[in-house]
Amino acid sequence: MQIALFQPDIPQNTGTILRLCACLDVAAHIIEPAGFATSDRTFRRAGMDYLDQVRLTRHDSWSKFEQWRRGLGHRLLLFTTKGAGSYLDYAYKPADILLFGRESMGVTDEVLAAADARLVIPIKPGLRSLNVAMAAAMAIGEALRQTGPAAKFA
């Protein structure tokens, strides 16, 4: 199981998600361009000393990420407010990549079209969306509940 962030623009959210990935032994991907540098103080504070523990790959562009992903044959599951099905009703596989869009705009039409599934976390009508770090935690929790953790923890 892996988490990918498409052009993230809020450093605190990205740091929090990378900390989550480190704690759960889940690989992480940042698809550039990000809206901040990894030296950003708020990014480092949110990730704390866990950033050195995460298996992080930075991809220079969407096309390079997509070439890498297709080469391995991994499914791409996009979490979006425009999802076609609930994330709770989906059957996850251990090699899936859970993709989250940019906080300010989501993903491009090209990314939307490339997704093998578009999933939504149902929320109360009239509200826009969850914080992306909270959405990532909920999504990876359900995916790992179904598939089991990547590593056995004591």
What are these regions (language model features)?
Residues 1-154:
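Post-transcriptional modification and biogenesis factors for structured RNAs
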